[in-house]
Structures are given as structure tokens and as C-alpha cells.
């Protein structure tokens, strides 16, 4: 909602036994380290920005919650496995490829989630409709972007899976 979670607020939140962790959506991966240190082993930190999944996991996030995972779940599962296997060179290459896909998903006039829905229709045969207001649907002008994003995902799967 546009509000940054501060270490002092998280420290206060940790006093509530119902708080088991936090999703960090800020871009600095140092914030993940801070929240991991504050919460300790009893609390989980999720990485938010899909573009930094690798960096977030290396800084201590135990998992991620991301908006683009649905368009390419196999790629994020592979990236997570590469981290577990300590194959960081390949992990970095895959993260770069994922970032190129994210760049394409976010380059249309329509909302990214609308683009993802169209990509899922092309790549997976899933017709799940469009986005609802206030999100902007994909336009006919966006068709080349959608097709390029779908192709990038297929090519990246062929390369890394």
C-alpha cells in the first residue's frame, strides 16, 4: 500500500505471537537481512520483488511471493533448486533471463496481470479472462508484446529446464 516496513515497526509486530514472518517488497536486499536478523529462526521472511529472487534468497529470504510466478512457475522452481544446489552461476543466468521476461511482461499498455493472462492462454491453453477495473486490459496494440513474452518464457524453459 505504499508504506515501507521499518525495522522498528517489525520489532513491534514481532511482539504479537500471530506474526510468523513478513513479505519484504522493498528493492534493497539489505532489508531482508535486517528482517531475518530481527525475527530469528522462528520467523520467516519472504522475498517480494521477483527481479531479485536470487539476491533475496541469498540474503536469507526462505521463499518468495511474486506476481510473475504464475506465468513461469517452473522457472522460479528451477531457480530455487539452483540456489539449493549452490549453482550460483547458472542461477544468476536464469535470474537475468527471468528479468528479461519481466521486462517484457511490464512493457505493454495493458496491466502486467492482463499480459500474464494472455501469456497463459498462449503457452498453457488457459483462458482465464482479462483483468477487472481499475486494471487496464491488454489492447490489440499489445499483441506483439504478449507474443514476445510468451516466446521468451518458452525459450527460457527450453534453455534451463
Which residues does each predicted region cover?
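C-terminal alpha-helical cap/extension of soluble enzyme domains
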Residues: 61, 72-161
Amino acid at each position: 500500500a505504499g508504506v515501507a516496513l521499518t525495522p522498528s515497526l517489525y520489532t513491534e509486530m514481532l511482539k504479537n505471537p500471530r506474526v510468523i514472518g513478513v513479505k519484504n517488497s522493498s528493492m534493497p536486499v539489505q532489508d531482508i537481512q535486517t528482517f531475518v536478523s530481527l525475527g530469528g529462526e522462528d520467523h520467516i521472511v519472504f522475498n517480494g520483488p521477483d527481479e531479485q529472487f536470487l539476491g533475496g534468497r541469498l540474503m536469507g529470504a526462505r521463499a518468495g511471493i511474486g506476481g510473475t510466478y504464475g506465468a513461469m512457475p517452473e522457472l522460479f522452481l528451477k531457480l530455487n533448486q539452483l540456489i539449493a544446489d549452490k549453482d550460483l552461476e547458472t542461477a544468476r543466468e536464469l535470474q537475468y533471463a527471468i528479468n528479461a521476461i519481466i521486462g517484457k511482461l511490464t512493457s505493454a499498455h495493458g496491466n502486467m496481470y492482463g499480459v500474464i493472462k494472455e501469456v497463459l492462454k498462449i503457452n498453457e491453453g488457459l483462458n482465464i479472462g482479462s483483468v477487472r477495473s481499475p486494471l487496464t486490459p491488454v489492447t490489440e496494440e499489445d499483441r506483439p508484446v504478449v507474443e514476445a513474452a510468451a516466446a521468451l518464457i518458452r525459450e527460457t524453459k527450453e534453455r534451463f529446464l
